[in-house]
């Protein structure tokens, strides 16, 4: 054991004398009677590395070896009584036993401390005759006349302990000298056996007659003394400390140690002193000398670690060497040896955890298991074990109520289906890898645009599935064959062949579809209006839910305002091993770090009054100019729309219908570029503010244009007396949507590419451009608004928009990677998605609801086309259906819902107002949390300053103490250096501030 730490670095070498693997070679000899002494380091006294060889280079008992670990007695040695700093020198200035020493540590006054003269944490060494520190005492470890001393010339290499109570101490024989002691091996009537706390005993028994034992036990195997077989089935015999005060003293064992072995293993209870941990006493960490020598006679015990060595001072040992208490090493926190990963639940802690999980509900049990710091496999095994134990208990107790069992099964099935659905949705999620690449290279600001595009794509997929299932498929069953010729120009104009298809409102029938005389009927009027209403209602609640979710995640949660430092420090996933994935993760981390640092820098920036005045003036000028440009564009669109109807009557060219969409698309492309140039004048410090301003200006422009067009459609086209004005409006919306898509593609592949050529080759000072988030996001909002308006007049618009968004994602991604550079000012866009959805909800979606409400409640449908032909208003189809339901008592609740909710035009406006009020309340809650977080942050900073002040005061007091008592620091310095020599390469975290400062000052190279 004494060579454990000294030879720890060489235990992996099979040729090293103390290599643990060499011990296994002798196991075959140990199992035989009278086995011969094989040449090796274990039992060869002449081997150079053996402990009993007095001339061994590594022997601790070699008196002339300068590096010996025995007690040195050279001048200025700690064991030399003439040394000024020794503890046994009564006249030493630093003597801790000197009552006049000003820095003498006070002695604890509790009774238990006085009853243990060998208590290691005692600051005052006992000087009674039996004390080890008394050099005149024969049993003292510092006495050279002691028979078992390491420095005794006639007893080299003895491993017999020299503390009082050891076998070779005649004055204090202890319990081992008593042949009738219950724990003695010479007492054949006792059924106990010894426990070896260390593995360095090499399996050699130390009782008399061990060499001639007929049946020598195997190495580290079963005990061989008489009556040992009776106790082989004791559950915790080899793993518990056997002294009497193990539970109240210094016990490293488990808190649930069985009580069955307390009365059996009592051999060491009478000789085991009480020790405190090194880290419990700040002064005890400075003592480098061992109160007891290391040569304790030991027997074998079951090994727990992978090297075959029991750790010195390991829990469960009968004797704990205070020299190794608190040392760093693979020592477990519990007394039992460590179990394998698959058998951890068999430990007392695992059984306790299982017992605590059984009475929990299913939801609480899942949360508790999920919070366990274990691997997924261990969590699954734990869940299976708990379910198995719970099923066993349920058979023993009374059966639960039928309703409770039903509710539990329903909740369990719901959780499983929810988890399965979540896994399926995650597996089919689009563009996960592409989005990670975009976020890693361009940051979260650019990534927010592509996330918004994907969200809109999912939205349109749902709308198309709904329309296709309840409107288009039933119409296919009664549709007539289209006799018009397809030329290909219909893709751009939307007229001709597409007019007599399911694409437009005028193609649908107004009759009730019924197959057979006794088959169920299908009312197309109700199906058409209810499907459109269900689609818009679903969009409404989806927008509310998404906006609330993003608002909660990005505004209310306090971790958003913590700077993300914790995430940046602890976010690395060590399961990522693929090279590309690792590089992508590194890019994401570096981008997030730059975003956090830029925000911290921008928050701390302050401007002077003149700078604020200049910027405010620039902002006012930019807003006036942008508002004037938007008003001029809206006026131009209005006059062009009024002229367009007359223009189409006089021109029969199929391309004439593209005039209005072409002009509107040119305005939508050119004006946002002009708005983006205002950044050169405004110069916002925070890029987020710049994006917000551009979004507000662009949304004002685009929604104003859409409002002008809606006014033109509802007041000019609807009242123009055309044969099917609903189809004309649907064709106009289709052309606007298609033209906007074409302009976006041309701008991506041609305009942005030309800008890249100019910036890289012609005018290099311009460089690559940055991605304009505001302009691109408003293109998506503009297109989606047109889709919602046109879904009533063109049910296939969600499908068309779905294809356009799919193509636009890849085109924007290619253009982004080729023609753009990352933002020069990195900033976090975690709140951008919330703002995008809010703009999509208001004013976009609310404006759509107003437009469709006016269409349904105020306008007369065409008399010769569409499902509502012949009705005075679109809503009259609902009125007639409600009148039919009012005659049936079972459907009166439907009548009430319609008349009080759906029939009220103001219902949607009231609901929108409620949402805005709730949003405002949440905003105020968020502001209050911001203030609280700021106050707590300041409190943490102040507490840190207070601690630094106290540390400085403590350092000053220690410096004053050092100047007043320099000799005590010399002693402590030598003790620390000796500890560093004995435990080289280990970190001792229990050194106090004074010892560390003394070591640094005494050894400047350190």
UniProtKB/Swiss-Prot annotation:
Residues 1-458, 509-525, 641-654, 720-732, 808-835, 922-1006 are extracellular. InterPro entries: TMC, TMC_dom. It comes from Homo sapiens (Human). GO terms for molecular function: mechanosensitive monoatomic ion channel activity. The lineage of its organism: Eukaryota, Metazoa, Chordata, Craniata, Vertebrata. This is Transmembrane channel-like protein 5. Residues 239-250 have a biased composition (Basic and acidic residues). The chain crosses the membrane at residues 459-479, 486-508, 526-546, 620-640, 655-675, 699-719, 733-753, 787-807, 836-856, 901-921. Belongs to the TMC family. Residues 480-485, 547-619, 676-698, 754-786, 857-900 are cytoplasmic. Probable component of an ion channel. Molecular function hasn't been characterized yet.
